[in-house]
């Protein structure tokens, strides 16, 4: 199993690479690429950790050597948020980066499962899809927007609020991966109940958690460590699905035939072909139904922006 991380010298990329080096199955290959010249050194640094995962690093303008034979590609390249920016401010820089990297994936590893971490995910996934379509290699079951950070934040915040063991908390988060498009389905959590005020406050905190980190870091960065953990969880789930493990389910932003939008985050069953099945997200409360319907204009505009960028 070969996993490639593009943007591996960045804050998310280094955290993700460290976690993958320690958690990928034995005899996996980990391939690190970044434009930054430090990248081969990141690989050497990681190679001193005693796990049966081979690490190689590649720097420069062309990621193709890192992508050869990749089964999974995780793309975290791009600029990070700074105070006062929202995820859409990142679009102008990150859109071109994602387009160029996905073009290389299409040419070098067209069958790989591609996880897009680079924000704004609502838009960059649509860009990736259009690039893959133009290359004639688009498979909707092999492209994912990584929204796992919204899931782990939801699970953490709910466990804190209710005094639960976080390992026992599972939360589906649907919609997209920015602001109002992030919708945790708190009504579905077994064994807990929330007041209307708690639901509103928790939902808002989950939606704005990225900003919470950006402001707390006082201009020194964004959510890199928690995002690295979230991306590792999702990447390992992709690997487990490819290896034939049963019942691997994660939420992700996919082209899954949703009635709501061309791309929509919801639970998916992972397998040897990527998405084996898009799962129904189940019954929702009145608050959740209203929030879902209210987000759709924003979400569809984000998607349209990505489609038009490529065309």
From Swiss-Prot:
Keyword NAD included in the entry's annotation: yes
Residues bound to NAD(+): 7-13, 34, 94, 117-119, 227
A GO BP entry: malate metabolic process
Family membership: Belongs to the LDH/MDH superfamily. MDH type 1 family.
Active site: 177
Keywords recorded for this protein, A-Z: NAD, Oxidoreductase, Tricarboxylic acid cycle
Transmembrane portions of the chain: none
Purpose of the protein: Catalyzes the reversible oxidation of malate to oxaloacetate.
Keyword field contains NAD: yes
Binding-site residues, substrate: 81, 87, 119, 153
Name this protein carries in UniProt: Malate dehydrogenase
GO molecular function: L-malate dehydrogenase (NAD+) activity
Subunit structure: Homodimer.
EC number: 1.1.1.37
Gene Ontology annotations for the cellular component aspect, listed alphabetically: cytoplasm
NCBIfam families in UniProt: MDH_euk_gproteo
Catalytic reaction equation(s): (S)-malate + NAD(+) = oxaloacetate + NADH + H(+)
């Amino acid at each position: 199993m070969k996993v490639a991380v593009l943007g591996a010298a960045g804050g998310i990329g280094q955290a993700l690479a460290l976690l993958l080096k320690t958690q990928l199955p034995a005899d996996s290959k980990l391939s690190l690429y970044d434009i930054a010249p430090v990248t081969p050194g990141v690989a050497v640094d990681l190679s001193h950790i005693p796990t049966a995962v081979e690490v190689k690093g590649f720097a420069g303008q062309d990621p193709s050597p890192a992508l050869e034979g990749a089964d999974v590609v995780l793309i975290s390249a791009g600029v990070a948020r700074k105070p006062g920016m929202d995820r859409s401010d990142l679009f102008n820089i990150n859109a071109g980066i994602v387009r160029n990297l996905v073009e290389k994936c299409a040419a070098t590893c067209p069958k790989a499962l591609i996880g897009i971490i680079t924000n704004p995910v609502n838009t960059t996934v649509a860009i990736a899809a259009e690039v893959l379509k133009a290359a004639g290699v688009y498979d909707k079951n092999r492209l994912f927007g990584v929204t796992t950070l919204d899931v782990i934040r939801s699970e953490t915040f709910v466990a804190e609020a209710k005094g639960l063991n976080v390992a026992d908390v599972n939360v589906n988060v649907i919609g997209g991966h920015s602001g109002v498009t992030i919708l945790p389905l708190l009504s579905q959590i077994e064994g807990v109940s929330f007041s209307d005020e708690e639901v509103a406050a928790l939902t808002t905190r989950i939606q704005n958690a990225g900003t919470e980190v950006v402001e707390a870091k006082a201009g020194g960065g964004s959510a890199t460590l928690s995002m690295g953990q979230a991306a590792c969880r999702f990447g390992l789930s992709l690997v487990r699905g490819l290896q034939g493990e049963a019942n691997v389910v994660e939420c992700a932003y996919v082209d899954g035939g949703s009635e709501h939008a061309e791309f929509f985050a919801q639970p998916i069953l992972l397998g040897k072909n990527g998405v084996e099945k898009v799962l129904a997200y189940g019954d929702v409360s009145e608050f959740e139904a209203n929030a879902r319907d209210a987000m759709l204009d924003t979400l569809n505009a984000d998607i349209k922006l990505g489609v038009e960028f490529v065309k």
